[in-house]
Amino acid sequence: MASLKPLLSSFTNHQIKVWVLAPLLETSDANIDYYYDFSQSIAEYEKVFAELGIEWEWQPVTINDYACIIDLIAKEKDFAHKTPVVFNLCDGDEINGTPGISVVKLLEEKGLIYTGSDEYFYRITTSKIPMKKAFDKARVPSAKWKAIDDKEDIENIFESLGTPVIVKPSISGGSMGVGIKNVVHNQTELQEQVNKMFAGYRGWDLAADGLIAESFITGPEFTVLISGSYNNLKEAKIYTPVERVFHESLPEQEKFLSFDRLWEIYEEETPMPNEANFYEYALPDESLIDEIKKISWDAFVACKGCGYTRADIRMDKETGKLYVLEVNAQCGLSEDENYTSIGAILRFSNVSFTQLVAEIINDAFTRLSASQLKRRIA
């Protein structure tokens, strides 16, 4: 355990108490409850903070009580003998009742040290529309796209984007609202899918910021973890990319993360034959690794990323060109590959989950120091 202490570069383990804020959604829907089940995460963080020798507390927050809880933590800053540090896992869009950006704004307002995304990065990546605009402005390659603001607003989609097209909610996490029927080939399929998405999923609003249609990129998919801040490349870390190798039985146009198969719900889609995995992880071809890292970093910078992110990339199998699908502020964190690709990235990078958590906490202190210096100069 002592060997892990050098990881804590910005503080000592006796000076802080970490509050892990986890989003709690109060719902009676089993499918959505499963998506927000953090029981496995609690065990992981118990192990992490035991190894780091840091006092910590797991604290669920809802959209209704997050302010009271953050007020309580802020009082510790003034009166307790340890500095509170908030390890923020809240990733909601707040449209459907899950806490998210309001938590970040209040943490900033209270002057608390917190991990992960700041308000700008959170906001620009919550909806795919401002994120895609940021990619376009920075000339980061991404799939051609078109916003759909209304279910009747679907003229000239195929003329603009080609065939096939994939339709996604502009605001969505964990592949919610994305399935194999989202890949459409003609106007009839497009209209049917758009109507369905505007109707929502089990009461979940999928069209709060409209939909986005993209050219479907046929080819391999990669994912990259970045920790740090866009304006501090020296201290940032771009992890080894991994490829999601989808099951060989799947047609090319079903080789993507659909909600049904990702979360093993199987309402409309079938599991893999012989109980095989939906996908496995592998290292990309060595010749692609630096290029994948570069385009991921460019996307992170385009969105002024901070804290950490997971960037998803696809490669056109015909041209070999790489395209950014998205960057995920507040992406799920776990070393368990059944829950998130971060586990596979850590495995291929030979980095423990404890090391990653320490990196993320250190980044919060680095950002605090930079912010304090900026205020002094101003």
Where are these regions (language model features)?
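Active-site nucleotide/adenylate-binding loops and adjacent lid/helix of ATP-dependent enzymes
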Residues: 2, 14-21, 76-80, 123-212, ...
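ATP-binding N-terminal substructure of ATP-dependent carboxylate-amine bond-forming enzymes
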Residues: 1-113, 120, 126, 130, ...
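Anion (oxyanion) recognition and catalysis
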Residues: 50, 108, 136, 159, ...
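Phosphate-binding site of ATP-dependent enzymes
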Residues: 189-273, 291-294, 322-323
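C-terminal active-site "lid" helix and adjoining low-complexity regulatory extension at the edge
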Residues: 283-287, 306, 315-378
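A long amphipathic alpha-helix within ATP-dependent nucleotide-binding catalytic cores
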Residues: 196-206, 260-317, 372-375
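Hydrophobic beta-strand scaffold residues
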Residues: 56, 113-114, 142, 165
